[in-house]
């Protein structure tokens, strides 16, 4: 069993933030990993920084924050990790997300429902989902399926 954790817009796991996000706290507590552990080193489970985090600049990537750019890459990362886990017999997953990360969590779950029907989503925790990608007010959502009807069973 593994956790796939999608953090919110601008959120990340660095010392530059004053407080860890709920997603990061949940991820670190999930299987007892130490608080100071680098989330990218965890085997099985996966923590994904929020869209538009400060990796590129002090203030973050404003266009990514505004339009949700980079979401497909994060979903692909999660699918790649799941594929590796599945090959070792892991077919039960938990998924969490906050803000746009919650929308990415739903998009990830919908990808699983369509492509990997043998994978079981045991738990899905979503905080304050922002299901908007691309230009504001459009229904297109840059190719993300953020409807919960396929993801929930």
Q: Where do the language-model regions lie?
A:
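N-terminal low-complexity, Ser/Thr- and acidic-residue-enriched intrinsically disordered segments
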Residues: 1-11, 15
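Gly/Ala-rich beta-loop-alpha elbow adjacent to hydrolase catalytic centers
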Residues: 7, 97, 101
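Short glycine- and Lys/Arg-enriched binding-loop motifs that mark or flank ligand-binding interfaces
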Residues: 46, 93, 97
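Short, solvent-exposed loop/turn elements at domain surfaces
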Residues: 12-14, 55-58
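Surface cap/lid and interfacial helix-loop subdomains adjacent to catalytic sites
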Residues: 5, 17-42, 58-65, 69-75, ...
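Active-site glycine-rich loops that stabilize anionic/oxyanionic intermediates
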Residues: 8-11, 51, 130
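A conserved beta-strand->alpha-helix junction
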Residues: 39-42, 46-55
């Amino acid at each position: 069993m593994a956790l796939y954790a999608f953090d919110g817009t601008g959120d990340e796991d660095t010392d530059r933030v004053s407080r860890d996000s709920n997603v990061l706290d949940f991820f670190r507590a999930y299987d007892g990993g130490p608080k100071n552990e680098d989330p990218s080193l965890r085997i099985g489970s996966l923590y994904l920084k929020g869209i538009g985090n400060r990796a590129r600049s002090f203030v973050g990537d404003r266009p990514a924050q505004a339009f949700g750019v980079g979401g497909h890459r994060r979903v692909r990362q999660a699918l790649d990790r799941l594929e590796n886990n599945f090959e070792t017999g892991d077919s039960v997953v938990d998924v969490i997300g906050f803000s746009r990360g919650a929308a990415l969590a739903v998009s990830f779950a919908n990808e699983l429902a369509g492509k990997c029907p043998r994978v079981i989503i045991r738990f899905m925790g979503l905080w304050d989902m922002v299901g908007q990608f691309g230009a504001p007010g459009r229904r297109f959502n840059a190719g993300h399926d953020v409807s919960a009807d396929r993801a929930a069973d």
